């Protein structure tokens, strides 16, 4: 999409294009290389795409895979910092976070997952179990390389991020509600103290968060 001309971008905008989903995947160049998706994606190119879409009023919806081997914690923190860069550049950008789940393809990532004790189900009954349904949604807590403390860090970061930058896809959120969410989360976001945001959890019970990956405009 970076090769599209300004005229093409303008035509897409004028035709009603509001949002584009992008698999940004990671804020780590090394992780992107290890994913080997066959493209030339880099964190810098992701930022350039976000910048360009902002100039045309088109919302980028970016998905990130958190906690990639061989160092899931360092990988997660690097991508968390990158997400902050994205939001600084374009506050309207939608962020979707998934936990790393392997695919059964030969490569470093899958080999390292197997070394941690990971194995895919062998029967249909195992595949349709609740644990593996969660796995298919990339939100499972059973993956051995993502320890519970790291999962909690990611969950807390996501809650603070979603309060400070409420999704633009939720038309139920009035201006007043958005201001309340931003006000109560601002000190945590700016100080990077994400741990145990109990006040935001309580607030989200009153103002339920609508996930952009399951709902649209």
Language-model region placement:
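A structural motif corresponding to the C-terminal lobe/cap of the Radical SAM core domain
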Residues: 1-176
């Amino acid at each position: 999409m970076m090769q599209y001309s300004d005229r093409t971008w303008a035509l897409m905008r004028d035709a009603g294009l509001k949002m584009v989903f992008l698999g940004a995947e990671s804020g780590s160049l090394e992780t992107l290389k290890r994913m080997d998706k066959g493209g030339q994606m880099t964190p810098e190119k992701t930022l350039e795409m976000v910048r360009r879409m902002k100039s045309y009023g088109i919302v980028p919806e970016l998905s990130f895979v958190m906690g990639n081997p061989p160092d899931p914690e360092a990988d997660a923190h690097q991508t968390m910092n990158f997400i902050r860069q994205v939001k600084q550049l374009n506050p309207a950008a939608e962020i979707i976070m998934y936990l790393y789940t392997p695919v059964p393809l030969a490569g470093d990532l899958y080999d390292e997952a197997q070394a941690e004790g990971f194995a895919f189900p062998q029967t249909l009954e195992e595949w349709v179990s609740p644990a593996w349904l969660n796995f298919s949604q990339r939100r499972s807590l059973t993956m051995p390389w993502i320890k519970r403390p790291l999962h909690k860090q990611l969950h807390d970061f996501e809650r603070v991020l979603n309060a400070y930058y409420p999704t633009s896809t939720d038309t139920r959120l009035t201006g007043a509600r958005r201001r309340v969410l931003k006000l109560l989360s601002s000190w945590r976001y700016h100080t990077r103290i994400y741990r145990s945001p109990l006040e935001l959890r309580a607030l989200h019970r009153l103002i339920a968060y609508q996930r952009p990956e399951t709902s649209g405009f």
